[in-house]
Amino acid sequence: YNGLPMDVAKVLVQDYLERYPAPKRMLIDITGCDRTNDELMAGFLSYSGQSFRLDTLIHNKLEKVWWGGKVSALFRYNNEIFQRALSHRNQTDAGWLLDRVISPKLATEVAQHQYPLEIHPYLLQQLREICAEAQTRGVDVRLVISPYFPQFAQNVANLDALKKAAEQATGLSVTDYSRALSDPSAFGDFMHPNIKGSKSFVDLMRNDGVLP
């Protein structure tokens, strides 16, 4: 999910591994350790009744939101997460990639846009625990940094520091694709490859053995 912080990702991964057969390989983009996202976390209140881990996380991090869900059941569903779930309920998940090309105007303004990554020890700990749990179940975990628009990666502060911190926290190497795509038409915006770029990204990961 776009903007999903690593603490929410951890409980979702733990629930998945507990309920379903473990995948052979799992890819994690370490930029999910960049920042917390309480607003997005609150949206998962819709599903807290189906996950003790999720319920506990929301209770510990957002106690007022958690109690709001106890006082009013409808409160649980007044959020973007549930609205998106309704929208996508009868649709395939095979078409979620961006189907647009970054506008020429925005592309020429790349030097004006800065993106300071943050380094959160708490979220790095969540990443470490995800990797450790998956590995105990035989999952081959690979860490990556996804591609950024050409020239934008140099505007992302602390990217190398975050990569180093993730490697130290997990003991795994991070494959950095932040500068891997040089074609501007492969992006829908500065941070998201479009369909064309995603195909190129997948090909790169296959060539590198990151994907089987």
Where are these regions (language model features)?
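Acidic-and-aromatic substrate-binding clefts and catalytic sites of carbohydrate-active enzymes
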Residues: 3-7, 118-123, 149-158
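Conserved SGNH/GDSL esterase-like catalytic core that processes O-acyl groups on lipids
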Residues: 1-51
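C-terminal regions of proteins
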Residues: 157-212
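Secreted/periplasmic serine-hydrolase-like ester/acetyl group-modifying domain
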Residues: 27-30, 39-137
